[in-house]
UniProtKB/Swiss-Prot annotation:
Source lineage: Bacteria, Pseudomonadati, Pseudomonadota, Gammaproteobacteria, Alteromonadales
EC number: 2.7.7.87
Catalytic activity, as annotated: L-threonine + hydrogencarbonate + ATP = L-threonylcarbamoyladenylate + diphosphate + H2O
Gene: tsaC
ATP-binding in keyword set: yes
Residue ranges of every copy of the YrdC-like domain listed in the record: 4-187
Name this protein carries in UniProt: Threonylcarbamoyl-AMP synthase
Length: 187
């Protein structure tokens, strides 16, 4: 870590384990450092989400996701389809690495990952030099926040708000299985 990072408020909060809300391609998301178990647990508590469900990681590029993915276990027949869909709003369930944190993968042998085209997400991932947890900014049973005001109404001052514009998608990312190609979520 170089000295110029010490005055980056986002990076300081990220490294301190804070949870933040930020615009994604379609809705506001909640994020944190995927390697910080306390931060992920705080995010899950805010969302009222069970850890067993797992979470999505979003990166600036596939290289950022490699520590969490067992790249050698991705079927050769699926690689072109997966990698040609990025950057973009498609999340893939890929085989998890042996070191992928259980608080991110839940009870699955797979990990949900996406390479984003959203300029703000790309910037945040570049500044952190790693992926972010990315899950919709809402609590169980409520629709995802579509504005900074909605984020504030859901979470008050419990998250750090990074304001910005949503991307052009009308719904959260499609989720597909990296082995079967089956669509798991098609909003």
């Amino acid at each position: 870590m170089t000295a110029n990072h010490t005055d980056d408020p986002f990076l300081l909060d990220y490294l301190a384990g804070k949870v933040f809300a930020y615009p994604t391609e379609a809705v506001f998301g909640l994020g944190c450092d995927p390697d910080n178990e306390q931060a992920v647990n705080k995010l899950l508590a805010l969302k009222q989400r069970d850890v067993s469900k797992g979470l999505i990681l979003v990166g600036d590029n596939y290289s950022q996701l490699l520590p969490y993915v067992d790249d050698s276990a991705i079927k050769m027949t699926k690689r072109t389809e997966i990698f040609s869909s990025w950057p973009g709003p498609i999340t893939w369930l890929l085989p998890k690495s042996k070191t992928a944190p259980s608080w991110v993968t839940g009870e699955s042998e797979f990990i949900a990952v996406r390479v984003s085209a959203h300029p703000l997400i790309k910037d945040l991932c570049q500044r952190a030099n790693k992926p972010l947890v990315s899950t919709s900014a809402n609590t169980a049973g409520h629709p995802p926040a579509l504005s900074a005001d909605e984020v504030t109404s859901y979470f008050s001052n419990q998250v750090i708000l990074i304001d910005g514009s949503l991307g052009g998608s009308r719904s959260p990312s499609k989720i597909r299985h990296g082995h079967s190609g089956q669509t798991i979520r098609d909003n």
